[in-house]
């Protein structure tokens, strides 16, 4: 196959910068009506009554729905329990309030202004109940995950005898870390346009999972999935919050059917904080044992993670912490804490970000306790074999990431003594390093290619364009394979009319779509009687067949998956495999080096530069891959120094649910981000040699920054985000 390392801009770059790129709800069908929600103002209890009189008096109001018969709108089921929704609970079907901000009425009107005004006029009386919204609340209920969800994927992680090895270790670290609730805050709000074309429901939405919407809303409404079409041309940021069926789509479909008009709903920013998933709060205890040289002998990793009352959102923190180093004695356990919130969910590097923050901070403490260089201790504890299964890694170039990153960063210039490096103005300077890993998962896919006599080729495959550049990666693969111009390639993703759609998340989008397209290209060459490789004259090849167009289709599954797993794909269910495969284990890796500057009088932390070197297999699209890493670093800066969703312990919900009050990094916070890649293909995972990148890009950033803050100040901060007042208290 032709190398894919030459640079090329995004295929959708021009459309994005000129405003021509169409997102989910950027359409206005004839007769479009607008919807808005009225929401609960208590955190738990029952609705006694809802007063809609004032809402009905607003000119233009067409519908006010406060209750839908459960037979008309069923639960979609929880995505992590074999269902389709981000949570199993479906609002508007009973009088129970499970969390603050839960919808209690859906208003549909001729204009957005009328719908919004009517929603604000709806009042309700409640019967409130005591609530728990934090890990330590008296009414929160804690369950052991391996007992509550007795399937291997969510079992305790055990290798060797970690307790005995830790007790015998001459150097020990025993520390606790706290991760906050956080929200995704994508630029594009959660929104939908739904309309009925006869008996067919058409949904336009920016989503990461068109297949779940298609099959999930069909289940809810009791219709065949073939009568539901979902189109998601582009997504204005997802990051995990848009990876499932949202609870508003079913009610919206019913409203559109009753009204006989298309209906559009755009959640407000505060509603995205209360009606969609979020990163749950967590508490981690990490115990590391080492010998005097810094060789890691034992690790014990115990986690408490927030979940909702109605669903158990499973935790996978120890999947990565058990495999980041060659620690033969490891014990990991996750516990879930039921609270009165909507169900939390996946947010970029959902478990790995905070898990590695804890582990890599503890490793840094071991380095200082043993007098070892933080880079050297990581290199010394590297491994080529998975310590959990004993299987080899399909590829692991984390040592190369560390060596290359250290050279690019200038790590040799670091004075190891904390508080020893200062700028001429007295600003404290700190250097920090951390590595990260993310499981190399993959899913089944069906790719359809159509080559025409005009020399163009269209591709339809499972995937969603959320800005990560999947269209560009697919275009590059096809153009390079056939030796044609990228402009001759048209790519369709996110459209259930064109191909079955699987969830795009967990960095398996590229590792799923590209192998399927690669297989379809092999089928196309065979059909056209062409050699396995080399440039193709599509016009001549197609014309020779006597048809104006040649269509081919290829189905691929992840290594070790049975062929019938494709049935799960067609049903819109999650069907991933990994990181354990027959004969090998796969992860992506990264090394981050961070410089921080801490102002000694104010405690303000700045991050003037970060160097990140990634091992993601073959780099499918250098331009978009580098953007993915830069974006992950920006996310890491925000998670470390800015982002926290403040909970209201009295009434439930989140207090800072707007972009004004939920601080994310702005341009002035972000400086130099130097990105590099190992760019070594991983042929065991798939024939294209690609591994995931979008998630691992964030993993380890917080630890690198936190370790740099320690180097600058001499103080460890084990609670994220690190606030100015925390730093000031120790300067």
Residue ranges and their predicted role:
Residues 1-150, 175:
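Flexible, low-hydrophobicity surface segments
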Residues 77-79, 168-182, 265-272, 426-435, ...:
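Short Pro/Gly-enriched beta-strand edge/turn motifs at strand-loop
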